[in-house]
Structures are given as structure tokens and as C-alpha cells.
Amino acid sequence: MIRAYPIIEDNMTAIWYHVPVCIRFISEGNIHALTGVNLILRNADGQILHESTISLSHIPPHSLKDYQLYVTSSSLCEGDDVNWHTCIPSFDIPLMERRVDNLYKYLNFFKESGFKIIPNDTVPRNTLMDLNILGLELKTGSLSKLIDPEAYRVIEFANAEASDSITIRSCPFSFTNPLLFSDFLSVGGVNLKTTKDNETLGYLSDIKYLENMAGGIVTKSDTTGSIGLVLGNLRKYNGDGDLIFILSWEIIWKLIMKRFPDLSIRPSMKSSSGVDRICSVLPVVVSENNSLFWGSCVYYNQTTLVTNNHVIKQYIDRPVLVDCKIFLTSDQTIKLTNEDVVITPYEQLDLSFIKLSFANQKRFKEIDNIAPVEYDYFYLTGELVSTIGFGLYFNNLYVEPLESTGNISAKYSLPLYKGDNATLPCIIVTSASCWNGSSGGGLFKQSSNQLVGLICSNAQVILPALGEEEDENTEKLSKTVLCIPIEVINSCYENLHTRDKSELNDRIGHTWNLIPYHNDIIVSKPKL
């Protein structure tokens, strides 16, 4: 159980501390490893009031009797020696008791949508119901008496918002080199905060998942606030991408207090500074018979949406046979009809405008938190930006986009139309992530939250040939994203309302298709 020390003290004046630990599970012919966290509640005199070592485990509790358990931490390593201490389970709490629990339904959606949940799916016959909060204690003594007090850091239990910077402290590659990886830092951002019934279930992040990272503690970078523990990796079967799921402390503490109702140690949750966000990026769902796919669109102005042509091309080609819906909320949609006009200004540009019918314009205006975008022409290479779109998966019960932060890696300018002398940006490359389904979403300048571009595609590169391989293998780069600049979008939109349509510069199409048109000139020193 959770260790409570016989000290009478007002817990409100005490402070929580934490340190990551590495946990091994060893049986005949089978090994597993997790990261965990040792939590202590310490008063002003340095006395420990409560202590608990916990992790999020994929090992079914009934199987634990077959394993020997060992724990270590970075301060228990001496020179080349890693000191492992025998430990035993002190409690286990199922993360989900019923299949109607919000957390079960949320994770099960991924299971039914072509995802594996790692490490849970690495154990044969495991189900989501096997996931649990595992408590550990040493066979003799307490872990806090072995770990260097200076190794502990203050922890506040907090919430986060999309785009917040986070750090995962974990112990990956436990069986490879625990000396090197006993307190490993991974830095990235929150892509999505998941809430249901006014409760934060957890967070998604595109930080790279590493083996044995489950149970790692996640903190808001450069703060003492922790938002939860790593539950695992949501990895799509087809290789489209993966995300880490972080279970919130709100859920973890709720389950612990339900198991141990007499405990008086539940900490208060430090709320995030997030505000209600105005939504300008919406999912587009295109369906025909039993096939369905989705993309994203931007609420461009009061009458118009903008997206990529490839997102709605099936609907454009076969409007009678194909349905195209825009999700406004989880339970409100609009369906495009022949009263909505779709215009693709140029075949060379993957850009389409949807002029909404009066009825659909009215539906948009009835939703309080949906508004047209504002845009910004002033952005520089290196500037911080965010991509917002419905990439990798679409869950109509949680109509929330993924948000990823990065920089403008490059932008290139050309005359947009034939005969023009003035140039404007015609392509932006960003390091913020996107995935299948993000197409048609927005690229936003972080400092102003204003639109600077439209997500179009990931870069796809040819991998080096190995040995005698003849097949050409390619790789999609989720952090190399091509976007249509706002200058191009606005100019094309204005051109819709002119009598004489300008002709697009051929080099625009060449640039977007990565067709080279430059001249290589080798400059050498003149002979004397």
C-alpha cells in the first residue's frame, strides 16, 4: 500500500517531491521493464509523511506472481555498478473497471481504428482491462532512504493545454544500458488535451516513444508542474504515424483515492492558464458507400471555407454519389449540397474554396466558439508556428484537432502570375508535424495565432538503397510539411471575383511538384 509515516502534521504545508525509477520484471524466458516514479510528501523539517512508488503497468496483476521485481534509480548507480533492489507489488488498481468508462471508450477507439497500444499489445492475449496502476515497495526498508535526497525534485500536480512544452523523464532501454538511460529527458509538446464530462483523461504528444518509457513522469518544461505519466504509444498499423498517450494525474489520483478512501494525501490540482479557444479549423469527412476518409478545412471568411483540392476531390467528381460533411461539433454537422459551390482556381495548386449556401452560413454563425480566421503576412524563416488539423485519426466523439509546434524552415517567393514582376511567397516548409488527415488544416503564427498558410502535404523522400536492393523505398517525413502561403490563398480568392482570370506562373506548379527549373553554374577560380 501507500506508506504513511507516523508523524502528525498539517499536510497542507508539506511539499511533494519525485524521482524517476527503473523497474525490471524477470521470469523464466520472459522479461519486461517500465519506468516509474517514487513520490514523497516532505514537511518543512525534511521529514517524510507519505511515500509511494507507482507506475502504469501493462502486465496483468494475476501474472505478477511469476516475476521477480527489481528497482533502481540514477542515484543508486555507482561507477560501473547498477544496484538493483528487490521489490514487491504493494497494490494494483485497474485503470478501467467497465467498458462504458470514458477512458476505455477513448482508448478502444484507437484499437478499433488500426492502432496498436504499446507496450500493452506486446503481451499475448492482453486487453485494455489489464492496464493498471502498479504500486511497489522494497522487501525491506523504503526506497526514499536509499535514494540521494538531492535527486528529488519538487512536483506540483497540474494540467496543460495544446502546444504547451513538456518534458518526459524516463528510463528507456532498461536491459541495454541503465547507466546511460536511468534518467533520460525527452522534450516536445502537447498535441491535444482530451477531456470528457469535465474531466481530463490525458494528453497526446508526438514525442518519440522509446522502449520502456511507459510510466515516465511528464512535466511542463521549465516548471515544477507535472501533468501525468506515460501510458504508452498509440501506433498506427500502416505506418502513418504514432503518438504518446499521457494519463492525467486527475485520473490517477481519482483511482488511488477510490482504492484508499481513508488517505488524506490527495494533492490539489494546479489548473492550466488555458482559455476557451476559438475554432477555425474543422474536419471534412467524405464518404461513398462503405468507404470513408477525412481531411481538414479552414473557416476562411463568413461565406467561405478553404481546403486542399485532394481532400474533397471525390465529392467534386461525383457529388451525387459522394457525401461531404463538415463537423462543427461532435453532434452537429453540415452536409454540402448543390447549393454550396466548390471552386478550384488552378489545377496546378492543391487549393479549393467552398462557397457556403445561406443555410450553411447560418449554421456556422450559430456555433459560439467557431469564427473565421485572421491572417498575418509578416512571418520570417525561423519563426515559431503551429499546425492545426485532424491528422492521423478522426474520432467524431472528440472533435478536437491535433496541434503541433515547430518553425518555418524555409519559404520561397516567385511571381504568382505570368507577366508579374513582383514576387510573393509561393511555398512554406515547416518543421511542425502533420499526418494523413491534416491536409487542409492551418499553419498559424504562434505570436499572433493568425493564419499564415494552409497545410498541403508531407515531404516524401527516397531512402538510400542498401546492398543489392532494387526496390525503391520511400519515407514520409511528418516534420517536413509543405504549406500554401496566405498570400497565395488571398490572391487566388480575390482572382475569383475578377472578370479576367490571371494565368498562373508555370514555375508555381513546378515548385509544388518539386520539378527543378534552376541552372547549376560551377564557379571556378580564373587561371593566372
Locations of the language-model features?
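Generic structural signal for buried aliphatic residues
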Residues: 32, 39, 164-167, 218, ...
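C-terminal cap/linker of serine protease catalytic domains
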Residues: 39, 56-93, 226-286, 361-363, ...
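Conserved catalytic-core segment of clan PA serine endopeptidases
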Residues: 49, 55-144, 269-276, 287-292, ...
